[in-house]
Amino acid sequence: MRILLTNDDGVYAKGIETLYLALIEEHDVTVVAPETEQSAVGHAITWLDPLRVKPVHRNGHFFGHALTGTPADCVKIAVAELMSPPPDMVVSGVNMGANVGVNVIYSGTVSAATEAAVMGIPSMAVSIDSFQPTDFSAVTEFVPRLLRIVAKEGLPPGVCLNVNVPNLPADRIRGVKVTRQGHMKMVERYDRRIDPRGHVYYWLTNSALLRDDDPATDSLALARDYISVTPIHHDLTHYEMIDTLGKWNL
């Protein structure tokens, strides 16, 4: 397959290099990733500034393209300008840190995959449950297998897969769970400081997790050492509320 590989940790991140090496022997892989880290930018796109693309070499060899934009920008520019015909599949990751629960909406990694789904391209986002992972073997074993299955079975229009992998060696993974997006979220705290000129500013710090207790959710499957695979889509409509709103005499 022709695969577009992107991420939100940036083109020089360990995770994207790991996925590239895991996929390159079996697939034609094109890397288009942000030049700088774009964690938690969500589905933002660049509107008021130009986008610049530059070649990137790693370990003395051409690796891919760095873009001065967001993960969603990377997918858009790759499909519109850098890959012809469009890719057969878009893979976003490996993200450092899980993307589960409500935090999915903040994720640039997941947003790259949902952007591809909006464009009608099968896609998946891949994250590992650590900001400093020590072993990618579970990722490099599972993702190529999942790609083969998706290529065979297909995905419904507008749907992508959100994959979260425990920070464990492959032989310690308990299995794979198909899950729903949970309600786990971060409870943010801000550190209030004062600069030398007396102006107040804030650092986001000391975030705590409100975890799910439903075994069908992505976060709990991950916490129990299972790989979590969640089908997600960009349609945010709450369909059950449509009839109710219609009775409000708006």
UniProtKB/Swiss-Prot annotation:
It holds the Pfam family SurE. InterPro entries: SurE, SurE-like_Pase/nucleotidase, SurE-like_sf. Its main location: cytoplasm. A divalent metal cation binds at residues 8-9, 39, 95. It catalyses: a ribonucleoside 5'-phosphate + H2O = a ribonucleoside + phosphate. Its EC number is 3.1.3.5. Keywords: Cytoplasm, Hydrolase, Metal-binding, Nucleotide-binding. It is found in: Cytoplasm. One of its GO terms (molecular function) is 5'-nucleotidase activity. SUPFAM superfamilies: SurE-like. One of its GO terms (cellular component) is cytoplasm. Binds 1 divalent metal cation per subunit. Nucleotidase that shows phosphatase activity on nucleoside 5'-monophosphates. HAMAP family: SurE. Belongs to the SurE nucleotidase family. This is 5'-nucleotidase SurE. The gene is surE.
